[in-house]
């Protein structure tokens, strides 16, 4: 039973990541990669807007009963996000957060509402 629930959560996550990707592409961003895993954390989507790498966290909540999707991005998650982005930049481009043009966006889905896009979330 637990394995089925996990697969369902994974497939739901993949579904919302695909929706976020399509939404961002309609808004002019170019897709680079998805689900980049590192020991320090994971990157849901990596996009590009002009010369800027955009690291996107995709969040989904059926309701905000236990807090909104955006509120679920706590300090610990933010640090993992930064660490994973730094690792990706180094391994793929021999750059770092200090040398690359980059930003951190959120695309949040709440219930049946349209996606909420927050550019430069860590701004």
Swiss-Prot record:
Tell me the InterPro entries matching this sequence: Restrct_endonuc-II-like, tRNA_endonuc-like_dom_sf, UPF0102_YraN-like
Q: Name one GO molecular function term.
A: nucleic acid binding
Q: May I ask which residue range the UniProt record assigns to the signal sequence?
A: none
The source's superkingdom equals Bacteria
Gene3D superfamilies attached here?
A: 3.40.1350.10
NCBIfam families xrefs: PRK12497.1-3 (NF009150), YraN family protein (TIGR00252)
Q: Which PANTHER family match?
A: UPF0102 PROTEIN YRAN (PTHR34039:SF1)
What family does this belong to? Belongs to the UPF0102 family.
Q: What is this protein called?
A: UPF0102 protein APJL_1381
Q: What's the source species for this entry?
A: Actinobacillus pleuropneumoniae serotype 3 (strain JL03)
